[in-house]
């Protein structure tokens, strides 16, 4: 019952049909569901399977979320995009990705769609040699950044927690639960057991 954008598959199948009519031997390999849509000023794109579909198929999957700039931060006009990359635990097989943002979304989803089609692992995203100039990207492209994050997970350098994990976090004092939003945001609503330490008061070690 998956909804697909059909223009691309239909045109490919038309060529395959014509090839076979003319004594060729072409086959359709299927679609991985790449699509993109414009919603007012924003762009939303997807490729492969999402987390829900992967779990329904019995795949033990993991994911990373990141919100990098569309191009180098010091170059004017950059805007934040948010990526979600889904991969299989253990094998790091790349399963799918979704992106929402304003510019550069289609470029990154096409890179990820190509990586899935080529059978690259999620760990190989960090090694992709992608075009860079400040108006168009960053020296560490958002796709590379996703690969760096997944590599950190594979080495056990970080442990991720997601909003759906909040209720399962211990409230016995064994861990410190921090809400790093501003005091006003904290006052508007917060999860039980979290203490407020605004990110504006945090200093990272140098």
Place the predicted regions along the sequence by residue.
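Short loop/helix-cap segments at secondary-structure boundaries that form the rim of catalytic
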Residues: 186-193
């Amino acid at each position: 019952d998956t909804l697909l954008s059909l223009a691309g598959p239909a045109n490919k199948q038309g060529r395959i049909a014509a090839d076979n009519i003319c004594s060729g031997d072409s086959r359709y390999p299927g679609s991985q569901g790449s699509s993109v849509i414009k919603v007012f000023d924003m762009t939303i794109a997807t490729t492969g399977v999402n987390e829900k579909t992967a779990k329904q198929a019995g795949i033990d999957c993991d994911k990373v979320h990141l919100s990098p700039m569309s191009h180098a931060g010091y170059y004017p006009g950059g805007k934040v995009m948010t990526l979600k990359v889904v991969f299989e635990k253990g094998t790091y097989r790349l399963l799918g990705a979704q992106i929402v943002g304003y510019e550069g979304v289609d470029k990154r989803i096409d890179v990820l769609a190509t990586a899935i089609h080529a059978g690259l692992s999620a760990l190989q995203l960090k090694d992709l040699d992608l075009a860079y100039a400040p108006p168009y990207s960053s020296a560490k492209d958002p796709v590379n950044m996703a690969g760096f994050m997944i590599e950190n997970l594979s080495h056990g350098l970080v442990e991720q927690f997601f909003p759906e994990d909040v209720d399962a976090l211990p409230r016995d004092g064994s861990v410190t639960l921090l809400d790093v939003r501003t005091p006003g945001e904290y006052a508007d609503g917060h999860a039980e057991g979290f203490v407020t330490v605004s990110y504006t008061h945090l200093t990272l070690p140098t």
